């Protein structure tokens, strides 16, 4: 969500963990200058607000990561800049303009279905359209594991049942179809799902049950990779 807004704005939401992205990065042993690429899965404020900050004089906004390319896609960027009434309050100009005007914005090439390798980033991305137009779901290989950043396709473990979609979804029936196909592939290919909105389950694996796909195991990032 970032730190640009006033406390009244933040009072409407429950923030979990470190509120400051900079301190979180520092705890991991890095600095903002080390970041080379930022992938915006989509441009709702809770997914991109931390990518830009006030300058020291609080006279203008600037990208937080001065050495990074910020990745979106052309369709979703246009969707956010000309928003529909349902999503308008989630697409904030102060999150978009600093990235675009700084020259840091780059677009990923688009495709229709499934995960495909993106030469620009050397990882795979899937596009989904139920939550918002052309949301990007990244998949990476790390330490012999396949990790998928589930973004708002599956925000929490409570959203694993196919009918349980977010109230924010612009096309809930599309979301259900996208989620069902993804979950089946996730079980088949033993994906590790990183859940952005789940305060209690950071990374999960999945299994088939008589009620559908459900959580198999739950890990913190440190448990899995340290």
Protein language model regions, located:
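Active-site metal-binding loops of divalent metal-dependent hydrolases
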Residues: 1-3, 43, 75-76, 130-132, ...
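Active-site glycine- and acidic-residue-rich loops that bind
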Residues: 48-52, 124-136
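Short acidic/His/Gly/Ser-rich catalytic and metal-binding motifs that mark active-site loops
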Residues: 3-7, 79-81, 156-161
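Metallo-beta-lactamase
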Residues: 16-19, 24-30, 34-46, 64-127, ...
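Accessory terminal helices/loops
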Residues: 113-115, 120-123, 140, 144-145, ...
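Conserved beta-strand hairpin/beta-sheet module of binuclear metal-dependent hydrolase folds
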Residues: 1-23, 27, 137-152
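Metal-dependent catalytic neighborhoods of phosphoester/phosphodiester hydrolases
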Residues: 49-60, 205-206
